[in-house]
Amino acid sequence: MNKIIIRKLFIFDVIEKKAKSVDFEDGINIVTSKGNQLGKSTIMKSIYYTLGAEVFFADRLNVKSKIHMLETDVNDKKYTFIRHGDVVVIKDGKGIFKTSNASELSSKLHDIFGFSVFLEDKQKKYVIAPPVFRYIPYYIDQDHGWTSELKSFDKLGQFDKKSRDLLFYYHLNILDEDYGVKLKEKKELDASMTDLKTRKKEILGLLAYIRENITAFNLEMDITALQIQKREILNKYKKYSYDLNNIRRKILEYQEEIFKIDNVIDNLNSTLKQNDKVREHIKHQFDVECPYCNNHFEIQAKDILRINYNIVDLEASKLEMLDIKEKLLGKMKKVQKEYEDYQATLKAIEEEKVDSENTLEDILKFKGLQETQNQLNTELVKNTGDIEEKSEDLKEIRRDLKKWQDEIDKVNSRYKDILNLNLIRFNTNEHALPEKYNIGKNLKASGSGQVRVNLARVYSFIKLLEEYNPTGLKYPLVIDSPKGGEQSTTNSELILRLLTEKAQISNQIILATIDFESFYNGDTKKFNIISLENEPYHLLSAEDYQNNQVIIDDFVSLYFEANQ
């Protein structure tokens, strides 16, 4: 049979040298004690925790100092799971696997269990779900599992409730990895179709606007004749525009020459000022004392003449530059006048009319509208083709999704029938379910009735699994404190009887309850009774550690070997 059987659980603390070992059997296992706080819940939480789930351990356990180990059979193959913190080690006949990554562990568990769940995370990506989503239908936690939401595991917030509820249909073998792929493709196609339809609406609006404007032109335009006239006007425009550019360049050349001349004149003026100062100084001081030898000498007349000559020469050059500048300004004035005339001519050409009331600007606008219309029509053809193609793709995807949805609706209806029956069997008052009720939908009850409602929900799903996926993997059903919530004696006896002798399911069952034998009157020999007799808060003991020293050392060695 395709099932997982928990054979042995070890919890040990290598620092305090304490341990707890528990042997389980295929069939029904009862973890019980006479009092509370002896460690029943710690044992129950440890089972799926060791398999990679996150659970609500009490702080006093100090799980960081503990190593958990499970010996399991999966389809008659032996697997050993070891967990410390986030690290999970798996040993089988082929070797050792180690990881601290939930996705890697999920992929490994797929190889072992032959089954995975794929869900959409909050980033809208379909991913292989963490290991816990394999175990949710099979575990009820004492502290968190008896509410209407059935939230027995920790750290489920990566996925919203709607996405999480899909996990049940993976267990039923209705959904698979392709479902997530198809949903993703549908969302992408829907977004693409929205964009295409928006663009199509824009194109049609633009084309309507263009048609209105072109119609106004068409009433008076012979396009062929206008095209000829337009070409003539354009040629004339190009010629004058070319000549105007040449004139503009000539003006720039004159302006550049004048700028250079102004620079030369400025330099001449500066030099003349300096020579004037020297000449004035010499005029009043012919007797000069040498600053080095203190001798007196007279300035030669030829030096005075040379200075005077330079000044005269510079002034002549300045006059020559001014004359050249004046001539250039005259030429530039003529060219500027020519430039203004050409500008006026171009403006007249721009406003020149053909054999209609439309100007060249109107014709150019008309031509532009025609070209835009052609481009938009081309785009519209492609847009329409893309919409048709994507519509066909969407139809195919919707057909596939509808098949899945039809199966989901069908199985929801069957689950509702089974649940209605079991709500009665578990003696609840919540019999009137909504017309449409899916497997993951919360069902609220008052007081102790919530416990019985939750048991009915979990039990109904397992019965549904046997109908819809009889060859699917059967996980251990782990239920902590099923007669909690201040159940009456009658209801407590009913619950234990329904979960044991009348269970009629092939999954391994592990129940934890206080004082089991006081509430069960049947034959207990067919059950594996695990009685806890330790002191409160002392589940682990030095004696258990010593009795299993060799096994514990082997596990510790195996764990550290995997972490090398």
Curated annotation (Swiss-Prot):
One GO BP annotation is: defense response to virus
InterPro entries in the record: P-loop_NTPase (IPR027417)
UniProtKB keywords: Antiviral defense
Q: Which Gene3D superfamilies match?
A: P-loop containing nucleotide triphosphate hydrolases (3.40.50.300)
Q: What does this protein do?
A: Component of antiviral defense system Lamassu type II, composed of LmuA and LmuB. Expression of Lamassu type II in B.subtilis (strain BEST7003) confers resistance to phage SpBeta. May be an ATPase.
Query: What protein name applies here?
Result: Lamassu protein LmuB
Q: Which organism is it from?
A: Bacillus cereus (strain VD014)
